[in-house]
Amino acid sequence: MEDQRDLRARLESSLAEGQRLREEVQQLKAILDQHSIPLPQLRTPQSPGERCLPAPSDISQVGTLSDNQAKITLFRSLFRGREDVYAERWRTKDGTWAYRPAGQKDWLAVLASSPSERRKVDRQTRTLYTVTDDVIRQHLAGKKTIGIYPLLLDETCWLLAADFDKKTWQEDSLAFLATCKGARVPAYLERSRSGNGGHVWIFFEAPIPAVLARKMGCALLTQTMERRHHLGLDSYDRFFPNQDTLPKGGFGNLIALPLQWMSRQNGNSLFVDDDLHQYPDQWQFVALNPASWGRSSGMARQ
């Protein structure tokens, strides 16, 4: 009985304290309004183990002349997927290029298995590499080409990317980009590494369910087709993430990251404007204000 009275007393005290804090917040807001001071943007707390985004002031100051670490920090705050695994581009035995999860093969386990089981055993025993600053540094320097798996373990995502990769990719991606702007959804067009396609990137202020992100993408795509009847959007290929839920035993689809140095030398893997001209300072262009991502998150949740 004593415990119940004590619990009730603490509950009443907490409720009173909460009311006092709410009144104090309202008073502070009134003072800010009186002096025309905007309410500071609060960042969403991250889940345990997740990296924090750099402060908006830090992001907005990054440009071509910034040091490499500042660029890497900015890059990782934008192009975020799973950090316990990433994909790397490699040349197969027949000379073609493909992507695979980066990791160390367990040769003893692979060679001990039958030839028909070796690929399966490799997937099961491979030690996967995690995303690090050095991995991003090598990508940006052109020493390797990496991709991310945007679908997180809890089936949320930090971003949505629309892939256009056929003959009409330019007009189709620009039409989609215009729809995003009309909906006040910040979106950014990258010419893909091949130069024959484009990715329209949309970022969120915090991870949102992939199903909501993809529904938002579909709504924007539908609006684009309704607004531009003469465009069939034949070049549209898919969204990343490409699944609402994580496939059993897999990572979901990967997307190659932009700004890879070797591709940039050919005018590809770069962000372009409405005339498909690359921005002079790529880093300044992607130095986005995280507060603007809230509009993307808000629309996705509608």
Please state what every model-predicted region is.
Residues 2, 58, 63-196, 203-219, ...:
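Signature for HUH/AEP ssDNA processing cores
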Residues 3, 7-10, 17, 24, ...:
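Heptad-repeat coiled-coil/leucine-zipper oligomerization helices
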Residues 17, 58-66, 241-248:
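Intrinsically disordered, low-complexity regulatory segments in eukaryotic proteins
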Residues 36-39, 190-195, 228-238:
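Short, glycine/acidic-rich hinge or "gate" loops at secondary-structure transitions
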Residues 41-66:
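Acidic, low-complexity intrinsically disordered tails
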Residues 51-54, 196, 265, 279-281:
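Short acidic (Asp/Glu) and glycine-rich catalytic loops that position anionic groups and cofactors
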Residues 140-141, 145-177, 182, 205-302:
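DNA replication initiation modules
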